[in-house]
Structure formats: structure tokens, C-alpha cells
Amino acid sequence: MERRLGVRAWVKENRGSFQPPVCNKLMHQEQLKVMFIGGPNTRKDYHIEEGEEVFYQLEGDMVLRVLEQGKHRDVVIRQGEIFLLPARVPHSPQRFANTVGLVVERRRLETELDGLRYYVGDTMDVLFEKWFYCKDLGTQLAPIIQEFFSSEQYRTGKPIPDQLLKEPPFPLSTRSIMEPMSLDAWLDSHHRELQAGTPLSLFGDTYETQVIAYGQGSSEGLRQNVDVWLWQLEGSSVVTMGGRRLSLAPDDSLLVLAGTSYAWERTQGSVALSVTQDPACKKPLG
């Protein structure tokens, strides 16, 4: 059954889970995987997936190392900033002590594989890689990382060609990666439009991820094949579904499960986000 969760209250209650060696805890694990991650946790491995990831830094800063168009790059995501990582971009999160970040990703399709790679220094040469169907990244990564640290490749720093795929399951993205942006500053700059009742997309329509900001007004969520995560940032709103009315106060969140219709009434001064990730909207390779 759907229930409200205060984001910061939930983080406070689960703060012990954000320390090493676990460093993360799932708030939701349905079609959408909504998780919060702490640190310190520095990594050498790069994760690759066919879906996108939303990052938001609740407390402190983080660094997301990525491979962008054949080059290594550090993306600094500061406290209060939001960022969308495109699909098929190798990425390696670097998190520090006393930080907490939100990450939203989706359940994988049965045809999709995730990859874990180590590169030779700052080159694009693959040192070690494993491809797998991802059910639970939190439990599946550790054995692969342990395998790497016990491997000949780790000891010698040289790849074993026979253990690398001649053709990966999919090509890496060639998209340019956007800069993180302050969520508060973006909302402030669009305050008039939001309070006039105009929903606005933070990242446009060229991604399968939709992060929509809503001000006062009403809307109906038709029955969808994907989950919808709602996060009330300011003011209040009421979500009605299945004959139940759920009031959302500032910082409350609600996961509307796939296949559920709902009505959403937002009061004057309300500001809220809606997050969806629909693999049916996957864009052509690029």
C-alpha cells in the first residue's frame, strides 16, 4: 500500500545505513528504485547501464567520475544540486564522509545488461569487465569487485584479451553531459510560471526520465506502466487514489505504483516534483 514518507525524517531514521561498508539504503524498490547513499566510499570501478540516473545531493558534495565522449571527466555535484546522467555512460561515484545523496533509477528490462569495468589508468583501455543482469546492484557489485582485486589483471595492471568482450552488449553514449544545477535556483527562476499552474520539465523531452516541477493547480495521473515518485518541496497537496486521500506536507514523498490512477490537488504556494523513468521512451543510440 502506498504511504507517505518524509524524506529528511526517513534519512535521519536510516542514517546508520549510510556509513561504510553499506553506505546506501533503498526507500523504494519497485519499478523505480529510490535510494539514498552516504560515504565515505571511493571507487575505481565504472558502472554502465542502459537506463538513466537522477542524482540530488541532500547533504554535502560528491564527485561523479564519467567517461564522456572518450575522455575521463569529474562532475562535481554540490549540496542542493540535481543532475541527470544519460544512459550508457560509464560512471564511478566518489562519496565523502557526512554526505547523503538521492539516486533514482529504474528496474532493468529483461533484455538489458549492466556492466562493471576497470580501465587502465586514465585511458579508454579496458582492464577488466563483467556484464550481468542487475536485480540488486547493492549485493551484486561486491563479488565482482572482490573478483577483480583477486585477479591477474589487478596484480599486473594488464588486461587479458580473451576475457574481454569483442563487442559489448551496447555502444557507449556519445551525448554531451549536462552540468549539475541548483534545484532551488531553478525553481526560483521559474516561480511565476509554476504558480500560474504551468508544469515545467527540468531536463526536457530528450530523455526517458521526466522530472516535472508543479506549482499550484490540479492534475490527473492516468494509469501508467511505470511508477511515479512525488516529492512535496513547499506548501501542501492532496493525492487521491483508490478512494484514499493522502495529504502531503513539505518534504513528504509518495510512490504511486505502476497501474494506479490518481488525482493531485496542489494549494497556492505549492511546489512539488514528479519523477518517472519509462524505458518505452528510450532514445536512439547516441
From Swiss-Prot:
Catalytic activities: 3-hydroxyanthranilate + O2 = (2Z,4Z)-2-amino-3-carboxymuconate 6-semialdehyde
Localization terms from the record: Cytoplasm, Cytosol
Region annotation (Linker) ranges: 161-177
Primary localisation category: cytoplasm
Keyword field contains Acetylation: no
Chain positions recorded as substrate binding sites: 53, 95, 105
Binding site for O2: 43
Clinical note on disease: Vertebral, cardiac, renal, and limb defects syndrome 1: An autosomal recessive congenital malformation syndrome characterized by vertebral segmentation abnormalities, congenital cardiac defects, renal defects, and distal mild limb defects.
Protein name per its UniProtKB record: 3-hydroxyanthranilate 3,4-dioxygenase
Gene transcribed to yield this protein: HAAO
